[in-house]
Amino acid sequence: MTRKVSRRLQELQKKVEDRAYEPLAALNLLKETATAKFPESAEAHIRLGIDPKYTDQQLRTTVALPKGTGQTIRVAVIARGEKVAEAKAAGADIAGSEELIEEISKGFLDFDLLIATPDVMPQVAKLGRQLGPRGLMPSPKGGTVTFDLEQAINEFKAGKLEFRADRTGIVHVLFGKASFSADDLLANLKALQETIDRNRPSGAKGRYWRSVYISATMGPAIEVDINALRDLKLAEA
């Protein structure tokens, strides 16, 4: 069944040419096509030349967006003893031990990110049914299994986020708000590109970057010139 495209989106699609845009031009177009009646996010959809069914072609890592995400995230921490108090002092919205594990097992998921200390991971791992479908299971690669709770909480609150390639090799990331300046969005998109390059899976063969599209939440897809993005040198802010 063909999905019906709204008249609004049809009009916006007319503004987008069937070509790859220079990064800054693409971001200006993203802002121009963010016309929904709510604050839209800036999305990146990046197709990579990897097959994640092979372990040496999986991509899961974190990126520190220099201009932040524009979102307020609720951080939960599972730890033991004094680490629970440390998490609360560092700004965790929710922190607990066995009692929090019990709440989550019963369906409590009122948070956007879960951090756990390594010593509680055997218990947290049993919450796969609750956490897995929402992408909330802590992982060392994602920076969410650590004893350094203060640093982790501060980084994620400031704009660090975890991402992964899905099973088709596509990375979907929100890299800011459409209300950000084009320059700020460019700084975030560049940080994302550099992180993906730096974490290229060892088993990736052939052409790594296949395509990059960006859009506002309710806007049309805009292709970004991959080579122009990778070659771009930004002055330090």
Curated annotation (Swiss-Prot):
CDD domains xref list: Ribosomal_L1
GO molecular function, one term: structural constituent of ribosome
Domain of life: Bacteria
Gene3D superfamilies in alphabetical order: 3.30.190.20, 3.40.50.790
GO BP annotation list: regulation of translation; translation
Pfam families membership: Ribosomal_L1
Family in the record: Belongs to the universal ribosomal protein uL1 family.
Subunit architecture: Part of the 50S ribosomal subunit.
Name of the protein in its database record: Large ribosomal subunit protein uL1
